[in-house]
């Protein structure tokens, strides 16, 4: 069947949808109305951005009164200068980590690692079935465990992507549609159980809205036929039920590139149990913008559309490129890098200001090995930092980061307002340097005890 139109009806391809979603394919037959729409969107974007910082303060910060307790159980004396330092965001700022240890040189690997750890607290690990298990029964768990160890050492939360996706069949996968579906669900059980405690956030089903697009039928005929035989609703419900049984405390994500009503109506609304309770924990929204930026107005509109489901939103795959595609290739440019930094800072500002959003994952960290060979990274091909890296560092670890000095009052109390996350407090008392940790969230008790212990000389 022919595709309907670039405005993305039910039969639009993934590529057409992404192009249409960026707003780059305006109707050339109606320039006046296109211009009017663009003008309205621009005005909306200006308003959304102008109000963003106040929303960020409202939704991302929290007040708390700390009661500092010394190692001998007594309140810290009044008038002590206390350093309060944030060490981790509650919000998940992340990226896929596919190139960890796989860059061309040891020096590039070191740069990749240090810069990743310098900005992100969240990493997406690859679980593409056709690549992860090239031979039946021989999954690449060794690679996963290597990445998990690195993430644990750098206090980076991990996510697996994806457990089920009919993008390409594993070469060895055979059988009836029922047997193929059974193999898929058994994979979910094995991986979630094996990696429990190492990876507890999962993209369970990826891109189910348009599972039967042409490239899926061509490259994943067996998996696609299995979904068709079951029906989309029963398939995704079985996948999520299987994942929940394997990991009771896991965070389960339904992920898609469709940001229109089709995702909401065809997939999310179908993903409920017999008691009409959602079977998912998070709605995952892809935001690849290879063809151009969404703009603040569209970004906010997407957030509002999916916030109505009353579940956290994760922007799971975000891309803005730093150079135009040409016949000679796709490379980064100085002008493109500045534009990428500006557009990314606006995109992150809008998302961080929306109360439903809890995570943003960039796709990919460096231009080396990037999807579509696009200049999409925070780092160039040689692992040097682009302006986007510095700009986002200034935001994530600067403007949206809390570090203050305060004076203790009676009973060792002091009050701060800070961005939600993990904190360290440090103070000198009777010649000793004392420190303690605490968490700050909207739900944090109004008065929170911080138990201080003596710090070593190097801290």
Feature locations, PLM:
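Short Pro-Gly-centered beta-turn/loop motif in secreted/extracellular proteins
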Residues: 108-118, 415-422
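A short, solvent-exposed beta-strand micro-motif common in secreted/extracellular proteins
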Residues: 421-431
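Glycoside hydrolase catalytic-domain groove-lining segments
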Residues: 146, 152, 226-254, 262-329, ...
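Substrate-binding cleft and catalytic face of glycoside hydrolase catalytic domains
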Residues: 122-135, 145-250
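N-terminal export leaders
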Residues: 13-21
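N-terminal secretory signal peptides
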Residues: 1-12, 25-27
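Beta-strand-rich domain onsets/edges
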Residues: 37-100, 134-135, 159, 231-234, ...
